[in-house]
Amino acid sequence: MKLPKEGDFITIQSYKHDGSLHRTWRDTMVLKTTENAVIGVNDHTLVTESDGRRWVTREPAIVYFHKKFWFNIIAMIRDNGVSYYCNLASPYIMDQEALKYIDYDLDVKVFADGEKKLLDVDEYELHKQKMGYSSDIDYILKENVKILVDWINNGKGPFSQSYINIWYKRYLELKNR
């Protein structure tokens, strides 16, 4: 599979553990790809839910996916600062159709003022039983929550303001070419 290049548009597909399609983002612009990571941007991107509902993202958001970590990061660039929505999810795969990952319900929200919240714990516990998440997956996800919180607390990667500035600036350059 050939990696997408800077400026290419890709589709992102989120699945549930049982294999059902959860959510699709159309036309995410690729800012950078490496052997292990994809950085992109969604800006007024069409999102389709599994029940067919559709909506459009409101503000630019830098998205970060990695092949070694069990989370992905959405940095939403708003007037009051950058807020983050982090999905606990499988490492991504990429094929001809889309960038794909399994969403494991748990989310970490980071508000512009730095406050953090772990979300959807009840949904995670319900789906863990219903879809049969293994004890290995449960352990991996809980360890990756710790890694993610460490990244947040230490301003690592997407949680660094300079990272956001660099990639948002690059997006604006590509958008205005």
Swiss-Prot record:
Keywords: Hydrolase, Magnesium, Metal-binding. Its EC number is 3.6.1.15, 3.6.1.6. The keyword Iron does not apply. InterPro entries: DUF402, FomD-like_sf, Ntdp-like, SA1684. Mg(2+) 2 binds at residues 105, 107, 120, 123. The active site is at residue 23. It comes from the Bacteria. The keyword Iron does not apply. It is an enzyme of class 3 (hydrolase). Its cofactor is Mg(2+). It catalyses: a ribonucleoside 5'-triphosphate + H2O = a ribonucleoside 5'-diphosphate + phosphate + H(+); a ribonucleoside 5'-diphosphate + H2O = a ribonucleoside 5'-phosphate + phosphate + H(+). Mg(2+) 1 binds at residues 87, 103, 107. GO terms for molecular function: magnesium ion binding; nucleoside diphosphate phosphatase activity; ribonucleoside triphosphate phosphatase activity. It holds the Pfam family DUF402. Belongs to the Ntdp family. Has nucleoside phosphatase activity towards nucleoside triphosphates and nucleoside diphosphates. This is Nucleoside triphosphate/diphosphate phosphatase.
